[in-house]
Amino acid sequence: FVMEFDATEIANLIKTKQLSPKEAVMTAFSEIKTKNGQLNAVVSLREEKALEEAKRCVDLARPFAGVPILLKSLGQYLEGEPATDGSKLFKDAKATQTDNFVKALQQAGFIIIGQSNAPEFGFTNVTDSKLYGPARNPWNPEFYSGGSSGGAASAVASKMVPLAAASDGGGSIRIPASFTGLIGLKPTRGRTPVGPSSWRGWQGASVSFAITRSIRDTASLLAAVQTVQPPAPFQTPLLSFNLEDQLPKNRKVAFSLNSPVQTKVSEAAKQAVLSAVNFLEEQGFEIEETEPKLDGTQLIKDYYLVNDVESAVMFSNIENALERKLKIDDMELISWCICQAGMDVKATDYSRMLANWDQAAFVMDAFLEKYSFFLTPTTAQTAPEVSHQFINESMRAKMRRISELSSRERTDLVYEFFMPSLAATPFTQQANLMGNPAISLPVHVASNGLPLGVQFVAKKGREDLLLKMGKLFEQNGKFRII
């Protein structure tokens, strides 16, 4: 029954000696062993070490002292633990140092019990690596739980753990939260610790945080891990707020049902937003259907260009470490194509792309001067089936020949093969490239019995607005969490 509670309640039980850290950790291990066979959410455990750390957990003043947590098996390194990044290339790799974000979790009192499933290098919006296999959805295991923090979402939605560490470089916290009926906050760029393994993940698009079941957990965790980190390339001032303060009703909310890349949006996704709009109007908010004037298609092409180039650098570093050239069989086909596409991008094109990001951030900031919130569906549809293939065989054949193409043809091919999966999740990426905070709230269940979230975006540094908006929905019984 312990894992029915959120992390705040488990921490309170530990503080008041009604539960020991060891009991909390043992309960989480028991839940994982019972449920993981069906869901494939967790890919490694550190039982002996976690139980030893739980026994030594005596400083109960820390906000999450003794609470068990999973790290994501991608870019959240703990010294001595697996460092696979979801890739067969690194199936035996171990982390040689601990990341600052992981240290922040430990300093908040969490006991790290293992790692959650993630797709290879986090490139996809479902979790389906050849190394680990698919992470399945607790609402219906025939469906995906999303990606790239799919294992984290499966583990939290199935109550293996009260919350799980995650990261978001294009929606990888918010997409799984939408697909599994959870809360997914992507903080402002520079809000949470980075390094030393990576300092500017995808030029600052990627940020670490967590997938959660309660707004109070989300707020307390943000307060616990936020930082101003002098060596980091991006900083944002520390946030101080009281979650009990009401959200002023004179805040304007803009909403849109349109895909930024002109793809189809399901009726379920539209209904999720319109229901939220009705609720907000009842609460006295001023609502307007409008959107920032942005070229969504160009922005997503710019987003993929960063993925291409940053990945090419990563693979070049891997080649140097391995002292050999990487081959197509070393990795999954998507990873190979992204790597190949990034090899020959001109520096002028890359610089122009970053300027486009900055201009988009300027446009969004001006838009959020007038409207405190921008509301959209989080995802354009509910979770896809595990049997669904986003990339068909003829496209795969084309991808296998990517090295024969010109530089422009390669980047065009990346956009082309990602389009079917992008169409399912086109709403999340812009907040990453602009640096804004965004939250997915679990407010809707579609007629197929699967959940779907709505997304609120706010000005940089204003996670407090997003959390108070989340609390408004939560305390009025609008959340649909299993």
Q: Model regions: which residues?
A:
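An N-terminal boundary/leader segment
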Residues: 1-44, 49, 482
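Acidic/His- and Gly-rich active-site-bordering loop/insert found
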Residues: 50-52, 57-130
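Short helix-loop capping/hinge segments that flank enzyme active sites or metal/cofactor-binding pockets
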Residues: 64-85, 252, 309-365, 381, ...
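A short helix-breaking turn/cap at a secondary-structure junction
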Residues: 186-271, 480-482
